[in-house]
Amino acid sequence: MDWQRLIVSYLVGFVLLNVLLGLMAYMTWFERRVLARMQHRVGPNRTGPFGLLQPIADGIKLLAKEDIVPANADRLVFLVAPLLSFALAPLGAAVIPFGDTLQLFGIEIPLLVADINVAVLYVLALGSVGVYGIILGGYASGNRYSLLGALRSTAQVISYELVLGLSLVGVFILSGSLSLQDILREQQRMLVLGPLTLPNWYILSQPLAFALFLIAAVAETNRAPFDLPEAETELVAGYFTEYSGFRFSFYFLAEYINMIVVSLLAATLFLGGIDGPFADGVWWLALKALFFLFFYVWLRATLPRFRYDQLMGLAWKVLLPLALLNIGLTGLVRLWGIGAL
């Protein structure tokens, strides 16, 4: 019945939201531990075994902080902007397939909140809309550093959203769909190349698109080495300079949830998602997403921050032409049927 499907969708969405929040909390622990190892330190190890309770302690500390509103801020917009960023962040996970249906008490439970035929466009649109929380927060703060950080973020998203979308056109051409379910099914086929039989993961047929997607995704999420909107040495803390307490935590939560959603999306689009060598399952998706999350941390530990002119030049002079080249090559391959794609 329709009402049963509706209730099941709400329940799956509620569970997914709580899982994302839990993963976000322990993503901070994971990042600090990995960075510490790379820098020959120990990392958080005092609160609980191996420091596993550190995210809880950090959350309690943030909730206990005073929520300060600057005197020259636009109060209403200042208060709402972080909530907007946080509310939009987990919505992208709603269209990511976490597996096939699950039978429980005679009811089929799809491991997917919403199956829409333009799922990838939906995720890209959310990425574009998410910048409104940043620009509104920077503008409403009444601080020049905050405003400059917000303007940087807007320009960065406009530049790299274009690269991100164009990098996926090759995947759309090969799969013939914008639905993540259809893209996942196409990758579950086997690819026969002479004596070799390989999974039809798009990282094999679209290596350039994969590299472009990774670079653009790091820039979209404002992570190092593309963290220009919150560059401490130039802008204090960028667009959230004036935020404190739990409102600061909303921006913090949104950034890490965006990282997790982008990692899940990359794993689904290029690495077969739940597809694995022995048996399909959500654990394969989790393992692949963990690889991308480690990639984020590794970049932060190894690369210095780009200059702003370098950041914009990379997008418009290097990545955009390469994305257009990849579309042309993929179209020719599809037209001529090379490699039985």
Swiss-Prot record:
One of its GO terms (cellular component) is plasma membrane. Its EC number is 7.1.1.-. It comes from the Bacteria. InterPro entries: NADH_UbQ_OxRdtase_su1/FPO, NADH_UbQ_OxRdtase_su1_CS. It catalyses: a quinone + NADH + 5 H(+)(in) = a quinol + NAD(+) + 4 H(+)(out). It is a multi-pass membrane protein. GO terms for molecular function: NADH dehydrogenase activity; oxidoreductase activity, acting on NAD(P)H, quinone or similar compound as acceptor; quinone binding. It is found in: Cell membrane. The chain crosses the membrane at residues 6-26, 76-96, 118-138, 157-177, 198-218, 252-272, 278-298, 313-333. GO terms for biological process: aerobic respiration. Keywords: Cell membrane, Membrane, NAD, Quinone, Translocase, Transmembrane, Transmembrane helix, Ubiquinone. Belongs to the complex I subunit 1 family. NDH-1 shuttles electrons from NADH, via FMN and iron-sulfur (Fe-S) centers, to quinones in the respiratory chain. The immediate electron acceptor for the enzyme in this species is believed to be ubiquinone. Couples the redox reaction to proton translocation (for every two electrons transferred, four hydrogen ions are translocated across the cytoplasmic membrane), and thus conserves the redox energy in a proton gradient. This subunit may bind ubiquinone. NDH-1 is composed of 14 different subunits. Subunits NuoA, H, J, K, L, M, N constitute the membrane sector of the complex. This is NADH-quinone oxidoreductase subunit H.
